[in-house]
Amino acid sequence: MLASYLNLFNTPWNSSISIIMILSNIMAIVVGRYSIKVRGLKPPIAISQLKDFGVPELLATMSLGHIIGVGSTIGLKTLNFITY
């Protein structure tokens, strides 16, 4: 109810939001790469730079990155740092 009042979920997609989402996902992958203790389980990813980093780890870090990105977008929109 508060979100509809503040009109937070009607923000059109623009380049600033995409940059926030990309940076949030990259940050989550980097943090997950060094903080996940049990990694490298099946199935692997076919990228040589991400050795011992499988599909479960990628899905977990990308999910965290999306949560961080959406929270950042809503917070920055509330503080009027993101404009149309």
Swiss-Prot record:
How does the protein associate with the membrane? Multi-pass membrane protein
Organism domain of life: Eukaryota
What the entry lists under InterPro entries is as follows: PSI_centre_PsaK_sf, PSI_PsaG/PsaK, PSI_PsaK, PSI_PsaK_bact
Where is the protein situated, by its record's location annotation? Plastid, Chloroplast thylakoid membrane
Which PROSITE patterns does the record cross-reference, listed alphabetically? PHOTOSYSTEM_I_PSAGK
Its keywords, alphabetically, are:
Chloroplast, Membrane, Photosynthesis, Photosystem I, Plastid, Thylakoid, Transmembrane, Transmembrane helix
GO CC term, one of those recorded? photosystem I
Q: Which SUPFAM superfamilies match?
A: Photosystem I reaction center subunit X, PsaK (SSF81563)
According to the record, the segments passing through the membrane are 12-32, 54-74
Q: Per the annotation, which location comes first and is thus the protein's main one?
A: plastid
Q: Which GO terms describe its biological process?
A: photosynthesis
The UniProt entry's sequence similarity note says: Belongs to the PsaG/PsaK family.
Q: What is this protein called?
A: Photosystem I reaction center subunit PsaK
| Annotated organism of origin | Cyanidium caldarium (Red alga)
